[in-house]
Amino acid sequence: MPKPTKGPRLGGGPAHERLMLANLAQSLFEHKSIKTTETKAKRLRPVAERLVTFAKRGDLHARRRVMGIIPSKSVVHELFTEIAPLVAERDGGYTRITKLGFRKGDNAPMVQIELVLEPVTPKVRSSRTSTATAPVAAAPVAEAPAEESDVPVEETDAVEHTDETPAETTDAAAAEVEADAAEKSDK
């Protein structure tokens, strides 16, 4: 969500800040990756993302809106013909900021902001959707964990009694599980 900027602007006044961000965006689209300060990169990210979204629309009005920000026709053409098709299936998140360390002269935090041009890998759906589609299959699965939940409880009791050997504890746990199963069948 865009928030109004409070405090000092980049480079002095608001007009100069707009020009600096336009130049940074032009360099980003021209070179696909630029190195700048962290503050400038954080301010550039929403501007660049909005311009890429316009480029994905691809109509004349979107091209004119981008030309109002970036004056270079060659960069706008590259944005609409080369970059937009590469990010067509991506819904936002067109840029990546990577920290590089601090600048030698003034110790300013430096970052690399780059366009994310890799194809999107689809996420695997969780198993919740499969259980919702097959509620009949979910019922036997719900009973099985209840029986298995008794076993860890017995193992924790076995851990407290250190006098018994591991073989004796597993035999005792198996006997208790069988006794519980017999009680369930009697009911």
Swiss-Prot record:
InterPro entries associated with the record: Ribosomal_bL17, Ribosomal_bL17_CS, Ribosomal_bL17_sf
Domain of life: Bacteria
NCBIfam families hit by this protein: L17
One of the record's GO molecular function terms: structural constituent of ribosome
Pfam family, one: Ribosomal_L17
Assembly, per entry: Part of the 50S ribosomal subunit. Contacts protein L32.
Biased composition (Low complexity): 127-144, 167-176
Annotated GO biological process: translation
Protein name: Large ribosomal subunit protein bL17
UniProt xrefs under PANTHER family: LARGE RIBOSOMAL SUBUNIT PROTEIN BL17M (PTHR14413:SF16), RIBOSOMAL PROTEIN L17 (PTHR14413)
Record's keyword annotation contains Ribosomal protein: yes
Cellular component terms (Gene Ontology): cytosolic large ribosomal subunit
Organism: Clavibacter sepedonicus
SUPFAM superfamilies linked: Prokaryotic ribosomal protein L17
HAMAP family found in the cross-reference section: Ribosomal_bL17
Coiled coil (UniProt feature): none
Compositionally biased region (Acidic residues): 145-157
UniProt keyword terms in alphabetical order: Ribonucleoprotein, Ribosomal protein
Disordered: region residues: 122-187
Keyword Ligase (UniProt): no
Family of the protein in this entry: Belongs to the bacterial ribosomal protein bL17 family.
